[in-house]
């Protein structure tokens, strides 16, 4: 059985706090087999992770959390950035054209600036036959969502429309990587993709913090990373 976390942010996200190397190191320490770096509307972090992955003994899937007009979408295996603010359908078409696949991020969740896709938008998109093979899953568990009931609603929704279930951390700090994870048969990224397409992935809830602890941890880490960025930017 393999274990993956397919929703992790780095300092390439405006609100991320961890370097790519730190993310890879932490993922290996906690026993993850596969991760995806999914920075907000940016693929540079994923590209860096792909370059460094072999040094840490972990597989990396290139990804991006794209801001669509209707909410956030996790895209995987894309090679170029996709313009934010497009409709969900147009975004999915562009993911498809790059040979990628997508998962709806934290559907129905709210709070902390989360821009979540609603069931109506997802169902509307799935009416388009040309993208049914692109939108393959629902993030049925988000490990750092402060809206706990949204995970339950997401699981019920995913069951109803028969898409793959993923559990992810949505980590913006190093401490929460792996708080949500996806179990799959096998251990490689190729095995994971087979499980996603076969709808056989399983959600694993690894850990959970209170909303206060999630927010306070992010705040402290963000201050630390901001000082580090400032120091690097100084001549």
Q: Over which residues does each language-model region extend?
A:
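A short beta-strand/loop micro-motif in the catalytic core of glycosyltransferases
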Residues: 36
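Acidic/Gly/His-enriched mid-domain segments of enzyme catalytic cores or analogous surface patches
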Residues: 107-111
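Charged catalytic cores and adjacent phosphate/nucleic-acid-binding surfaces used
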Residues: 1-6, 10-16, 20-26, 32, ...
């Amino acid at each position: 059985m393999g274990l993956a976390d397919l929703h992790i942010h780095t300092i390439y996200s405006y609100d991320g706090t961890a370097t790519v190397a730190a993310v890879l190191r932490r993922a290996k320490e906690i026993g993850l087999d596969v991760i995806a770096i999914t920075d907000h509307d940016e693929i540079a972090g994923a590209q860096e992770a792909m370059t460094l992955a072999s040094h840490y003994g972990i597989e990396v899937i290139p990804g991006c959390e794209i801001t669509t007009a209707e909410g956030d979408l996790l895209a995987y295996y894309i090679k170029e950035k996709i313009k934010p603010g497009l409709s969900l359908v147009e975004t999915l078409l562009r993911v498809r054209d790059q040979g990628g696949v997508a998962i709806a991020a934290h559907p129905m969740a709210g709070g902390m600036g989360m821009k979540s896709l609603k069931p109506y938008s997802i169902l509307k998109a799935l009416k388009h036959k040309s993208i049914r093979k692109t939108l393959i899953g629902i993030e049925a568990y988000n490990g750092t969502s402060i809206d706990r009931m949204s995970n339950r609603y997401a699981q019920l929704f995913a069951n109803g429309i028969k898409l793959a279930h993923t559990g992810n951390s949505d980590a913006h700090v190093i401490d929460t990587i792996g708080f949500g994870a996806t179990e799959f048969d096998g251990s490689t990224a190729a095995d994971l993709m087979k499980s996603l397409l076969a709808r056989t992935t399983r959600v694993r809830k690894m850990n959970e913090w209170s909303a206060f602890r999630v927010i306070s941890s992010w705040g402290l880490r963000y201050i630390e990373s901001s000082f580090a960025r400032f120091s690097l930017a100084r001549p």
